[in-house]
A protein has these predicted regions:
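A long-range scaffold signal marking pre-active-site subdomains of enzyme folds
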Residues: 22-475
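Single, functionally critical "micro-switch" positions that shape active/binding sites
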Residues: 16, 168, 420, 491-492
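Residue-level detector of functionally pivotal "anchor" positions at catalytic/ligand-binding pockets or at interdomain
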Residues: 463-491, 506
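Bacterial Sec-dependent N-terminal signal peptides
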Residues: 1-25, 476-480
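C-terminal outer-membrane/trafficking sorting elements
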Residues: 483-563
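Conserved beta-strand and immediately adjacent loop positions that scaffold enzyme active sites
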Residues: 160, 237, 480, 510, ...
Length: 563
């Protein structure tokens, strides 16, 4: 079927020869796309399977799109020792302090989140708790042990799974109105994809395991009722934490890249290219008929093009401020098994060769150059095969009539210093376009679709209120931004007979008191700010007090009544 040559070096680069989390990955379905995710963060084809990492369904058959993908990270320690790790194969499931129990993937849908919010809103209590919500691995979750069978670590640097913190106490509790979200730096509004799959794993950049990289990975999608670009797009959100010991050294001349191995049906007849001004890469078919090969089915007539977009990358410090690291290069390299390519352009086999590619050089250290396959020329460049395939006189694989073979693509950033404890985000999108007139026109439409994907990201994925962009009505759910909580307080707590209510913002509201079965025990209409209410002869115990303010916003707090 497909090559396995890159696998052995990937295991070596993991920093440990221990086989972490090698059980089968789960399949995630989105529209007619299928992608796999390993509980250890692996983003590759299932081991020993004829399946690809990403496939599309055509006529009841899964057709290949991408064999595998993953982040590469490399740099120099304070003794100038080269360290490189490859996240394609994943790592040790769990956080650095608590690996046990994390050999699984947590999944949640927008429908479940909306159901939870509606359940809480009707009476201030959750009557039908959902496992996806109550078992979400977020910091402070008091229900996690009951649903998952093990305790969460106390204070991981990366904060575990992201959530909407309704009362801003820093702890996740669905009973307080909290719920899972996608958290993106700079976006202060909750992002609720149609589906999210979350895992956490740890990579070690050295055999001594003293330089760990803790990684959270969320694979997320938006499913729209309309015919929409997001129906053909999957997103990857990495959060990387450099978990060296306190006082540990930085990683210098750090390079971060995204590696992809596209196989559009037959793996031998694909071309690749780049849109440098968008920092996006793509793959397309060299002919308008994709016939199966090497036991892989083809995509048939007018095969689609697929695009790869890095929406967010690492940060560095300049003039005491955090700034985004600029793009560096997009370049291909080639399989040594399929096709006849110079050995200096094929898969890396040691740390130095990986680092060469991360720096924008070929495996043998020579630069990427204009012309042919990008090797051995005199004019150096950073971006291979830029622009649309059909450009007379331009350097593209189509115009160069490059030979058949199995291509990979690497998209990388400029060097930066990875400080001890640094937290970086990488957000990547993979989008399929198939509405073009032919295999070359697919790339023209793909560029516009990549622009739309970037625009949704720029709007913090508020897909249902996206201005001039095509609206996306999420399938099976109606999710909007949650109303801000009513601002109020009461004291004392615990209380005996009298309770004072403070509503400083709205000055008045309606108050309801429920017991833990959801039964309404008492209510007060038009309560004003700084009002004392009488609790009467309530039995001692725990209650829920819900305020509805003059704008219809609700907020619930727990009240302990004592004798």
């Amino acid at each position: 079927m497909k090559k396995r040559a890159l696998y052995s070096i990937c295991l070596l680069l993991s920093g440990s020869l221990t086989a972490w989390g090698q059980s089968d990955p789960i399949a995630i379905f989105h529209n007619d796309l299928r992608v796999f995710l390993g509980e250890n963060g692996a983003t590759k084809a299932p081991t020993g399977s004829a399946d690809m990492w990403l496939s599309v369904e055509q006529e009841n058959e899964w057709i290949p799109l991408i064999f595998q993908s993953g982040l590469w990270l490399g740099g120099l320690d304070d003794e100038s020792t080269l360290l490189v790790t490859d996240l394609t194969e994943g790592g040790q499931p769990g956080t650095l302090e608590a690996p046990e129990g994390f050999d699984r993937i947590w999944q949640v849908t927008a429908e479940e989140i909306e159901q939870h919010r509606a359940d809480l809103a009707d009476n201030g209590l959750v009557d039908e708790p959902l496992e996806a919500i109550y078992g979400w691995p977020a910091v402070g979750n008091p229900h996690f042990l009951d649903y998952s069978g093990f305790e969460l670590p106390d204070s991981p640097l990366a904060g575990l799974a992201p959530f909407w913190d309704q009362n801003a106490d820093g702890l996740y509790d669905p009973d307080d109105g909290d719920f899972p979200i996608l958290s993106v730096r700079g976006c202060d509004i909750p992002i609720i994809p149609t589906q999210m799959s979350w895992c956490i794993f740890t990579m070690f950049m050295d055999q001594e395991q003293v330089r760990p990289i803790e990684c959270q990975l969320i694979l997320f999608t938006f499913a729209c009722e309309e015919a929409h670009p997001l129906n053909n797009t999957i997103f990857l959100h990495y959060r990387l934490v450099h978990r060296v010991e306190p006082g540990g050294s930085a990683l210098f001349d750090t390079r971060l890249g995204w590696y992809l191995d596209p196989d559009l049906g037959c793996l031998l007849d694909d071309y690749v290219g780049s849109f440098p001004d968008r920092f996006a890469g793509f793959a397309y078919n060299r002919s308008n008929e994709d016939v199966g090969c090497e036991s892989l089915p083809g995509l048939g007539t007018n095969p689609p093009a697929i695009g790869f977009d890095l929406l967010r990358g690492p940060l560095t410090i300049e003039n005491n401020e955090l700034v985004d690291v600029d793009i560096s290069h997009i370049m291909p390299f080639y399989s040594p098994i399929f096709g006849s390519f110079p050995s200096g352009t094929t898969d890396p086999s040691n740390l130095s060769e990986y680092y060469n590619y991360l720096q924008g050089f070929w495996r043998d250290g020579t630069p990427l150059t204009v012309g042919g396959i990008g090797y051995g020329g005199s004019q150096t460049t950073q971006f291979a095969f830029p622009g649309f395939p059909a450009q007379p006189g331009a350097w593209t694989e189509w115009e160069a009539n490059n030979p058949d073979g199995d291509r990979r693509l690497l998209m990388a950033y400029e060097p930066f210093e990875l400080q001890a404890g640094a937290v970086n985000e990488v957000i990547a999108a993979i989008t399929l376009y198939r509405d073009g007139a032919d295999h070359l026109d697919q790339v023209v439409g793909l560029r516009d679709q990549l622009d739309q994907v970037q625009a949704y990201y720029d709007l913090c994925f508020q897909v249902e209120n996206a201005g001039d962009l095509p609206p996306c009505t999420q399938v099976l759910t109606d999710v909007g931004e949650p109303a801000p909580a009513a601002h109020w307080s009461f004291f004392p707590n615990p209380a005996f007979q009298t309770l004072q209510i403070d509503i400083p913002d709205q000055k008045r509201g309606d108050l309801a008191l429920y017991d833990l079965t959801g039964r309404l025990c008492a209510s007060w209409a038009e309560i004003e700010d700084e009002t004392a209410i009488q609790l009467g002869a309530l039995p001692p115990g725990l209650y829920v007090l819900t305020l509805t303010d003059s704008q219809g916003r609700q907020s619930s707090q727990k009240l302990l009544v004592v004798q």
